[in-house]
């Protein structure tokens, strides 16, 4: 979300770009500028996101762990994309929550057919898992209105200082504490 609003782009460091070669290739096909450095990549937003078809595969193929984030981008593309999940079953559980935000996604077996929309609307959504939950937060950052993501224990377990890192990029995100439910 912060990246979508910032013309300067963002530096993502601390990794070898070769290890994410297929992800960067697909992002470039979507119109996103990915300038590789020795220890990461400088990513700049696209004027228009282009649709792309993706199949998850073992390394060096497209990693299943990045499928949810790419689905968020694909849901905003100018056209239709297909994501085929070849590694895990039930990996599209977050897609129904993304639809609640205005995405146009149809799931058939291990395929997600995604038709790009102009934008997302804020909504109350539930994180079904680690990767899907993070993708919902990203979608919420670029949505019109407020998005509340519940069941964030998945995200907290898997991403260290997730909220703080997004805030450092300029994102308007906070971890809200909700009271324990009262059982009658």
Descriptions of predicted regions:
Residues 1-184:
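Short, structured segments at the rim of ligand-binding sites
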């Amino acid at each position: 979300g912060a990246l979508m609003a910032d013309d300067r782009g963002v530096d993502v460091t601390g990794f070898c770009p070769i290890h994410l070669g297929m992800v960067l290739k697909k992002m470039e096909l979507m119109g996103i500028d990915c300038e590789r450095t020795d220890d990461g990549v400088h990513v700049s937003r696209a004027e228009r996101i282009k649709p792309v078809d993706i199949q998850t595969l073992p390394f060096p193929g497209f990693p299943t762990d990045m499928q949810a984030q790419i689905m968020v981008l694909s849901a905003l593309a100018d056209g239709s994309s297909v994501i085929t999940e070849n590694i895990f079953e039930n990996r599209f559980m977050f897609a129904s929550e993304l639809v609640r935000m205005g995405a146009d996604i149809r799931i058939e077996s291990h395929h997600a057919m995604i038709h790009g929309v102009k934008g997302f609307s804020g909504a109350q959504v539930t994180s079904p898992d680690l990767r899907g939950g993070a993708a919902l937060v990203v979608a919420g950052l670029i949505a019109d209105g407020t998005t509340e993501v519940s069941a964030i224990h998945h995200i907290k377990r898997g991403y260290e200082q997730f909220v703080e890192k997004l805030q450092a990029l300029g994102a308007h995100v906070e971890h809200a504490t909700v009271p324990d439910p009262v059982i009658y």
